[in-house]
Amino acid sequence: DRKEPLFGRRDALIKLNPFRTDTIKEIIKDYKPDYSNEDLLALYTYTGGVPKYIELFMDNLVTDKDSMISYMIRDNSLFVSEGKNILIEEFGKDYGTYFSILGCISTGINTQANIEGALGGISIGGFLKRLVEDYSLIAKIRPYGASEGGKNIKYEISDNFLRFWFKYIHKNRSIVEMGNWKLLKKIISDDYTTYTGDILERYFRQKMIESMEYRYIGNWWNPKNTENQCEIDIIAVSADNTRVDIFEVKRNPERYKEGVLKEKVDHLLTKQKELKKCTLTLGNLSMLDM
C-alpha cells in the first residue's frame, strides 16, 4: 500500500539493504542513458540506494536533481512525512529526544558533548548507545589510529535519506506546516553543492568498501584544541596491509591542491608512525571518478 511508510515496520527498518553503487548506476542508466554524474550523485544523496525510494523516482521519471527536489517537496509527498512515519513508532514516548539528537547530528553537531550542550545539558549517553546498537541509525566515527576506548568520536546518520530528512524537513517544520514548498525547495537547492560534498565522500567510501580491496576505510582528523587543525577525507589500508590510499574528495578536481594534502599526510605520519612502513598513494577523487 503506497500510503504506508516506505520502510514498513521494525523488521524492514533494520534489514532492508540498499543497492550497491554499481547497481544504482545501472538503474539510472536504464531510465536515463545520458545521465550525468550530477544526476547519479543526486540519486545517491536522496535515496542512499534504498530500493523503494529509487523505485518511486524512476517510476515517475524523476532522474535529475531539480526534479527530485520538486517530487519530494510538495503536498501529500510520502518523502515529507517519511522520517516521522518510520521513527515515531520505533522510538515510542522518547521520540522527541531521539529526534532532537538526530537533528543535531544532521547539522554537524556531532560529538556527545556538543549535542548535550545544544540540548541544554541533558545526558544522552544511553540514547546514543541505543541509536548505534539497537536501531543502527547512527554510526560512531573515530579517526584512523584511535583506540576503541578513546573519546575522540563523532557520530553520523547512517542512512542518506534520513540524514536529508532531519537536516531539511525536520529542521524546517514550520515551513512544512505552512506548506511553503517554494521556500523549502529554494533552501535545499541553494545548499545542494555544499551538502553533497560530504555525500560524495560517503559515496566513494561505499564504493571502496564494495571493492573488497581494503581492510580499513575511514578518515582522520586532529583532536580539538591541537595546534595543527587538519582533516583527511579518506584513508584506505589495503587488504595485505602494505599500501595506504589517501584521498582528498572535491566535487571540482580543479580545487584539489596536492601540496596541501601532502602537508596533512606529513602531519599524520608524526602521529601514526606505522604508516611509514607502507606504500602511500595520494590523490584526489571528484565527480569525474564516480
Where are these predicted regions, by residue range?
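Phosphate-binding site recognition
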Residues: 1-182, 186
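A cross-kingdom feature that marks ATP-driven nucleic-acid transaction machinery
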Residues: 151-290
